[in-house]
Amino acid sequence: CIRDRNTTMNDIALASKKGRRTLYTYFKSKEDIYMAVVESELDMLSDMMKRVAEKNISPDEKMIEMIYTRLDAVKEVVFRNGTLRANFFRDIWRVEKVRKRFDAKEILLFKDVLREGVEKGVFRIDDIDMTAELVHYCVKGIEVPYIRGHIGAKLDDETRDKYVVNLVFGALHRT
């Protein structure tokens, strides 16, 4: 993978079917390429979440689907690339820097769905902005344990989902 110490820019050029000079035109180092890959993955995740937010389903269904879409997509990206997985856990602060734009987009999507839920009488919440940020940071906080399989590891999916739904909808005062 890109961040392997033995991987050279020449290896990356061969794998990407680009010339080494072409790579150096856009990237200064392997590290820059790695961060571009992380950013690209986050853009795809953002698009996936936007598609869920735009679905013609109830706001409560959207919230749960957005949460699972995010967690499952991050887990899939991390496991698809073993080095990315190792670096995700080891280099979290660097990844955090790249994630700022994604985080802002995600909070806006949560706000839109929460607002829709309030307008339709599905949720009773006082402060949509604060609630969207709290949902975002709660989901972000369980990301690593979810990826590592620590959340609901001894439960079947249906039971685990029931707990998640009860927690999320309890917090949003679903009517």
Predicted ranges, named:
Residues 30, 37, 41, 45, ...:
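Hydrophobic/aromatic residues within well-ordered alpha-helical segments
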Residues 1:
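Active-site loops and adjacent core secondary-structure elements that bind or stabilize anionic groups
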Residues 71-109, 119:
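Short secondary-structure transition hinges
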Residues 124, 128-132:
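Membrane-interface starts of transmembrane alpha-helices
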Residues 52, 81-88, 146-150:
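Secondary-structure edge/capping motif, primarily at the C-terminal ends of alpha-helices
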Residues 4-32, 36:
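Helix-turn-helix
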Residues 36, 40, 50-76, 131-135, ...:
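Hydrophobic alpha-helical connector segments
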Residues 108-120, 133, 137-175:
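C-terminal peripheral helix-coil segments that are non-catalytic and often amphipathic
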